[in-house]
Protein backbone atom coordinates (compact mmCIF):
# COMPACT_ATOMS: atom_id res chain seq x y z
CA UNK A 1 0.00 0.00 0.00
CA UNK A 2 0.99 3.64 0.35
CA UNK A 3 3.11 5.45 2.88
CA UNK A 4 1.90 8.59 4.63
CA UNK A 5 4.40 11.42 4.88
CA UNK A 6 3.24 13.98 7.47
CA UNK A 7 2.82 17.66 6.73
CA UNK A 8 1.38 18.41 10.17
CA UNK A 9 -0.54 16.31 12.73
CA UNK A 10 -3.65 16.11 10.52
CA UNK A 11 -2.35 16.32 6.95
CA UNK A 12 -0.06 14.05 4.99
CA UNK A 13 1.17 13.22 1.50
CA UNK A 14 -0.08 9.89 0.15
CA UNK A 15 -1.02 8.14 -3.08
CA UNK A 16 -3.85 6.05 -4.51
CA UNK A 17 -2.41 2.61 -3.80
CA UNK A 18 -4.88 0.32 -1.99
CA UNK A 19 -2.41 -2.35 -0.92
CA UNK A 20 -4.43 -5.04 -2.71
CA UNK A 21 -1.53 -6.44 -4.75
CA UNK A 22 0.94 -6.66 -1.89
CA UNK A 23 -1.67 -8.23 0.37
CA UNK A 24 -2.49 -10.82 -2.29
CA UNK A 25 1.20 -11.67 -2.72
CA UNK A 26 1.66 -12.16 1.03
CA UNK A 27 -1.39 -14.43 1.11
CA UNK A 28 -0.22 -16.44 -1.90
CA UNK A 29 3.27 -16.99 -0.49
CA UNK A 30 1.85 -18.03 2.85
CA UNK A 31 -0.44 -20.45 1.04
CA UNK A 32 2.62 -22.12 -0.49
CA UNK A 33 4.09 -22.62 2.96
CA UNK A 34 6.40 -19.61 3.18
CA UNK A 35 7.04 -17.91 6.51
CA UNK A 36 5.94 -14.37 5.66
CA UNK A 37 6.65 -11.07 7.40
CA UNK A 38 4.20 -8.56 5.91
CA UNK A 39 5.40 -4.97 6.28
CA UNK A 40 2.46 -2.78 5.35
CA UNK A 41 1.70 0.89 5.16
CA UNK A 42 -1.76 2.32 5.92
CA UNK A 43 -3.48 0.23 3.23
CA UNK A 44 -7.21 -0.01 2.54
CA UNK A 45 -7.10 -3.81 2.42
CA UNK A 46 -6.86 -5.78 5.69
CA UNK A 47 -3.75 -7.97 5.96
CA UNK A 48 -3.98 -11.74 5.52
CA UNK A 49 -4.63 -13.81 8.61
CA UNK A 50 -2.03 -16.18 9.98
CA UNK A 51 1.10 -14.22 9.08
CA UNK A 52 3.28 -11.77 10.96
CA UNK A 53 2.16 -8.21 10.22
CA UNK A 54 4.25 -5.09 10.84
CA UNK A 55 2.33 -1.85 10.37
CA UNK A 56 4.18 1.34 9.46
CA UNK A 57 3.27 4.85 8.40
CA UNK A 58 6.16 6.54 6.64
CA UNK A 59 8.88 5.46 4.22
CA UNK A 60 11.54 5.72 6.92
CA UNK A 61 9.48 3.47 9.20
CA UNK A 62 9.05 1.00 6.34
CA UNK A 63 12.80 0.85 5.75
CA UNK A 64 13.48 0.21 9.43
CA UNK A 65 10.83 -2.53 9.59
CA UNK A 66 12.14 -4.15 6.42
CA UNK A 67 15.70 -4.24 7.70
CA UNK A 68 14.48 -5.68 11.01
CA UNK A 69 12.70 -8.49 9.12
CA UNK A 70 15.91 -9.65 7.43
CA UNK A 71 17.46 -12.10 6.78
CA UNK A 72 15.05 -13.60 4.28
CA UNK A 73 15.26 -15.88 1.27
CA UNK A 74 13.21 -13.45 -0.82
CA UNK A 75 12.05 -9.87 -0.45
CA UNK A 76 9.14 -8.53 -2.49
CA UNK A 77 8.66 -4.77 -2.65
CA UNK A 78 5.12 -4.04 -3.79
CA UNK A 79 4.46 -0.95 -1.66
CA UNK A 80 3.93 2.44 -3.27
CA UNK A 81 6.49 4.28 -1.18
CA UNK A 82 6.49 8.07 -1.34
CA UNK A 83 9.55 9.44 -3.13
CA UNK A 84 9.64 12.61 -1.04
CA UNK A 85 8.70 13.83 2.41
CA UNK A 86 8.30 17.26 3.96
CA UNK A 87 11.67 18.22 5.36
CA UNK A 88 10.31 19.69 8.57
CA UNK A 89 6.78 18.52 9.34
CA UNK A 90 4.95 20.88 11.67
CA UNK A 91 4.19 19.73 15.23
CA UNK A 92 0.98 21.76 15.19
CA UNK A 93 -1.74 22.13 12.57
CA UNK A 94 -0.88 24.65 9.87
CA UNK A 95 -3.45 27.44 9.85
CA UNK A 96 -4.94 28.92 6.72
CA UNK A 97 -4.19 32.61 6.45
CA UNK A 98 -5.83 35.03 4.05
CA UNK A 99 -3.72 35.29 0.92
CA UNK A 100 -1.03 33.06 2.37
CA UNK A 101 0.17 29.62 1.33
CA UNK A 102 2.47 27.45 3.44
CA UNK A 103 5.90 26.96 1.89
CA UNK A 104 6.78 23.27 2.07
CA UNK A 105 10.34 22.12 1.53
CA UNK A 106 10.80 18.51 0.46
CA UNK A 107 13.61 16.01 0.76
CA UNK A 108 14.08 12.58 -0.75
CA UNK A 109 12.94 9.50 1.11
CA UNK A 110 15.21 6.47 1.49
CA UNK A 111 15.11 4.06 -1.44
CA UNK A 112 14.08 0.82 0.24
CA UNK A 113 14.32 -1.39 -2.85
CA UNK A 114 17.81 -0.14 -3.76
CA UNK A 115 19.01 -0.33 -0.16
CA UNK A 116 18.14 -4.03 0.15
CA UNK A 117 19.15 -4.90 -3.42
CA UNK A 118 22.64 -3.48 -2.91
CA UNK A 119 23.35 -5.06 0.47
CA UNK A 120 26.81 -6.58 0.57
CA UNK A 121 25.99 -8.94 3.45
CA UNK A 122 22.72 -10.71 4.15
CA UNK A 123 21.08 -9.80 0.85
CA UNK A 124 18.05 -11.97 0.09
CA UNK A 125 18.63 -14.54 -2.65
CA UNK A 126 15.80 -12.99 -4.65
CA UNK A 127 14.76 -9.33 -4.59
CA UNK A 128 11.61 -8.40 -6.48
CA UNK A 129 10.48 -4.84 -7.13
CA UNK A 130 7.51 -3.19 -8.78
CA UNK A 131 7.48 -0.33 -11.27
CA UNK A 132 4.24 1.62 -11.54
CA UNK A 133 4.60 3.63 -14.74
CA UNK A 134 2.43 5.79 -16.98
CA UNK A 135 4.74 6.16 -20.00
CA UNK A 136 7.28 3.90 -21.75
CA UNK A 137 6.45 1.23 -19.20
CA UNK A 138 8.88 -1.51 -20.25
CA UNK A 139 11.81 0.80 -20.97
CA UNK A 140 11.40 2.68 -17.71
CA UNK A 141 10.97 -0.50 -15.68
CA UNK A 142 14.00 -2.14 -17.30
CA UNK A 143 16.08 0.92 -16.48
CA UNK A 144 14.74 0.88 -12.93
CA UNK A 145 15.76 -2.76 -12.48
CA UNK A 146 19.32 -1.92 -13.46
CA UNK A 147 19.42 1.23 -11.36
CA UNK A 148 18.03 -0.38 -8.21
CA UNK A 149 19.95 -3.64 -8.51
CA UNK A 150 16.98 -5.96 -7.94
CA UNK A 151 16.68 -9.37 -9.60
CA UNK A 152 13.15 -9.08 -10.94
CA UNK A 153 10.79 -6.21 -11.46
CA UNK A 154 7.09 -6.30 -12.26
CA UNK A 155 6.07 -3.39 -14.44
CA UNK A 156 2.53 -2.14 -14.76
CA UNK A 157 0.79 0.76 -16.47
CA UNK A 158 -1.07 2.75 -13.83
CA UNK A 159 -2.43 5.42 -16.18
CA UNK A 160 -5.94 6.43 -15.06
CA UNK A 161 -7.51 4.76 -18.10
CA UNK A 162 -6.24 1.32 -17.00
CA UNK A 163 -8.13 1.33 -13.70
CA UNK A 164 -5.30 -0.63 -12.10
CA UNK A 165 -4.36 1.72 -9.27
CA UNK A 166 -6.93 0.97 -6.60
CA UNK A 167 -8.73 -1.59 -8.80
CA UNK A 168 -9.13 -5.36 -8.58
CA UNK A 169 -7.12 -6.30 -11.68
CA UNK A 170 -3.54 -5.89 -12.81
CA UNK A 171 -1.60 -6.30 -16.04
CA UNK A 172 2.10 -6.79 -15.43
CA UNK A 173 5.26 -7.57 -17.32
CA UNK A 174 7.91 -9.54 -15.45
CA UNK A 175 11.37 -8.19 -16.25
CA UNK A 176 14.43 -10.27 -15.40
CA UNK A 177 18.00 -10.57 -16.63
CA UNK A 178 16.65 -12.87 -19.36
CA UNK A 179 14.17 -10.33 -20.73
CA UNK A 180 10.52 -9.31 -20.46
CA UNK A 181 7.59 -11.69 -19.99
CA UNK A 182 4.19 -10.08 -20.52
CA UNK A 183 1.36 -11.53 -18.45
CA UNK A 184 -2.29 -11.17 -19.47
CA UNK A 185 -4.58 -8.90 -17.50
CA UNK A 186 -5.94 -10.84 -14.54
CA UNK A 187 -7.09 -10.33 -10.98
CA UNK A 188 -4.51 -9.23 -8.46
CA UNK A 189 -4.99 -12.55 -6.67
CA UNK A 190 -4.09 -14.39 -9.88
CA UNK A 191 -1.02 -12.20 -10.38
CA UNK A 192 -0.01 -13.00 -6.81
CA UNK A 193 -0.47 -16.74 -7.28
CA UNK A 194 1.60 -16.72 -10.47
CA UNK A 195 4.36 -14.65 -8.90
CA UNK A 196 4.43 -16.75 -5.74
CA UNK A 197 4.87 -19.93 -7.75
CA UNK A 198 7.68 -18.37 -9.79
CA UNK A 199 9.41 -17.31 -6.58
CA UNK A 200 9.04 -20.81 -5.13
CA UNK A 201 10.47 -22.33 -8.31
CA UNK A 202 13.40 -19.90 -8.33
CA UNK A 203 14.31 -20.70 -4.73
CA UNK A 204 13.84 -24.46 -5.03
Enumerate the predicted regions with their spans.
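Glycine-rich phosphate/diphosphate-binding loop of Rossmann-like nucleotide-binding domains
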Residues: 1-58
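Short, ordered loop/turn segments at secondary-structure junctions
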Residues: 2, 41-44, 80-82, 132-135, ...
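Alpha-helical scaffold segments in soluble metabolic enzymes
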Residues: 24-28, 61-68, 74, 115, ...
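Structural beta-sheet core signal
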Residues: 38, 77, 127-129
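Glycine-rich phosphate/nucleotide-binding loop
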Residues: 86-184, 189, 194-204
Amino acid sequence: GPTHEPIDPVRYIANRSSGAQGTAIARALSGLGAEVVFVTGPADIPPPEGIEVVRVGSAREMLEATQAALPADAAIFAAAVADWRVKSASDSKLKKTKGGMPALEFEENPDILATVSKMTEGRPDLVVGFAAETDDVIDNATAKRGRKGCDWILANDVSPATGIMGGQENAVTLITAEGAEEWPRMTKAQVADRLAQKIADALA
